[in-house]
């Protein structure tokens, strides 16, 4: 039975908020904080990507944590292992909850990120973040062989989770049933797909085993962002049963 949207008019319970990541794909911290504040009753995780981090740096992470969000630092680190390790260490010391590292460079590269972010958090007296391996971007078409190989890299490197499209979840869960799965490209039915080649509805993603849904333009560029957030929270609640 569909959840009653009116139950979520003032916000969503933590069990739903913790599974919804708000993509703050803007280039200034003032705008990011304004958007985040307005939608915080429904979203418990703030995604700080390359655009916002390039504009505001560590301040973006610190501001979102200070405002009460978990931070998903979506930086897709891809460099030599030493550099990845050092960058991840910095992000861990800032208190991020999630950090993305690209799987393309292989196990050593991923392991450097896993160890770096954990060491940075430990040195700062903070809980260990979840290092997420980026598999195949949702703006790309999937290659099954590459996907399976990259999921294997995630497991071998000790990553706590990965980022994949909803359409890849069945493959991912068969190989790595216990990792945290983060799914971007979420679009409620009837909303444009923008540049996402493999979008999914919240219902479909949850049913396929997604743990965290990343939602950006479907809410931030909606005619009524609050109404869009309420609808998504209600849809997730229905999917969770």
Model-derived features: where do they sit?
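Generic structural signal for hydrophobic
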Residues: 38-39, 64, 91, 154, ...
């Amino acid at each position: 039975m569909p959840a009653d949207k009116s139950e979520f008019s003032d916000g969503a319970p933590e069990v739903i908020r913790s599974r919804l990541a708000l993509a703050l794909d803007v280039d200034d911290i003032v705008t990011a904080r304004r958007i985040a504040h307005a939608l915080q009753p429904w979203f418990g995780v703030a995604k700080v990507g390359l655009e916002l981090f390039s504009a505001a740096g560590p301040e973006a992470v610190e501001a979102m944590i200070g405002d009460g969000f978990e931070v998903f630092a979506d930086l897709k680190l891809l460099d030599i292992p030493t550099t990845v390790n050092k960058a991840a260490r910095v992000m861990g010391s800032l208190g991020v909850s999630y950090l993305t590292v690209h799987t393309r460079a292989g196990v050593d590269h991923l392991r450097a990120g896993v160890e770096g972010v954990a060491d940075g958090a430990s040195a700062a007296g903070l809980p260990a973040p979840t290092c997420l391996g980026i598999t195949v971007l949702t703006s790309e078409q999937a290659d099954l062989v590459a996907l399976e190989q990259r999921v294997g890299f995630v497991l071998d490197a000790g990553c706590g989770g990965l980022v994949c499209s909803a359409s890849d979840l069945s493959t991912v869960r068969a190989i790595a049933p216990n990792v945290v799965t983060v799914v971007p490209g979420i679009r409620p039915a009837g909303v444009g797909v923008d540049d996402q080649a493999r979008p999914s509805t919240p219902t479909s993603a949850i049913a396929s085993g997604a743990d965290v849904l990343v939602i950006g333009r479907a809410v931030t560029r909606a005619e009524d962002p609050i109404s869009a957030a309420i609808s998504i929270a209600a849809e997730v609640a229905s999917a969770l049963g």
